[in-house]
Amino acid sequence: MLSINLSLCAHKKGMGSSKNGRDSESKRLGVKASDGEFVLAGNIIVRQRGTKIHPGVNVGRGKDDTLFAKADGLVKFEKRGKDKKFASVYPVEIEQSVAE
């Protein structure tokens, strides 16, 4: 005689489980140096996706559209035309006091 032992398993997960509870890690985008702030060459000014703010004077653009300072100076956000925003860095002389 042929006998088959068939056991059935639940096809639903049961009470208490949820399909929620995941989220992606934040990317920490945004302005990192405000208008009028002194920055050193290489400092990040804006982290962004796409060019919402374009590079101006003494500002470079990384491959991920991050804007960074190419020279030491003060950050200035400017608007050119109707809808284009630019970030520039203007060099400034800093007096260094010598302790005697």
Curated annotation (Swiss-Prot):
PROSITE patterns: RIBOSOMAL_L27. One of its GO terms (cellular component) is cytosolic large ribosomal subunit. NCBIfam families: L27. One of its GO terms (molecular function) is structural constituent of ribosome. Transmembrane segments: none annotated. InterPro entries: Ribosomal_bL27, Ribosomal_bL27_CS. It comes from the Bacteria. Residues 1-9 form a propeptide. Belongs to the bacterial ribosomal protein bL27 family. The N-terminus is cleaved by ribosomal processing cysteine protease Prp. This is Large ribosomal subunit protein bL27. One of its GO terms (biological process) is translation. Pfam families: Ribosomal_L27 (PF01016). Keywords: Ribonucleoprotein, Ribosomal protein.
